[in-house]
Amino acid sequence: MTCTPRIRFSFVAAAAVALAFLHPTTVVAQDASRTYTLAEVETKPSLASMASFQRLVADGYPEDLKRRRMGGIAEVAFVVDASGKVEPGSVEVVHATQPAFGEAAKKALLMAGFNPGKVSGAAVRTKVSLPIVYKAQ
């Protein structure tokens, strides 16, 4: 006795395949030198590991400010490249409640890993702005 597999025809699946041939997906080549804004990307850059980034921020907390139990914020703008790395020359402190928080934020970002932004499924360079909050413990 042989067993033959049953194949069920699905009209919905057949229609989807037919539509794929009628309207093929177009993948647009991205300009590798272009920097996209968050509004232009379909997938926004994200931290590869929030826990790792939090450790980087905590480990880089300026000692003098930690001793004085001072908290604050550093808002930084930077470019995440297509491989998920922060471009070193792109990091700028937009605002910091203490200059030391701005410097610490820059150092943490340069060691952090990101999932890059994407356009049409392709990883692209993306400009990001991020507030980093330092809380005194």
Regions found by a protein language model. Give the residues of each.
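Charge-biased low-complexity segments
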Residues: 2-10, 23-137
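Bacterial N-terminal signal peptides
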Residues: 12-22
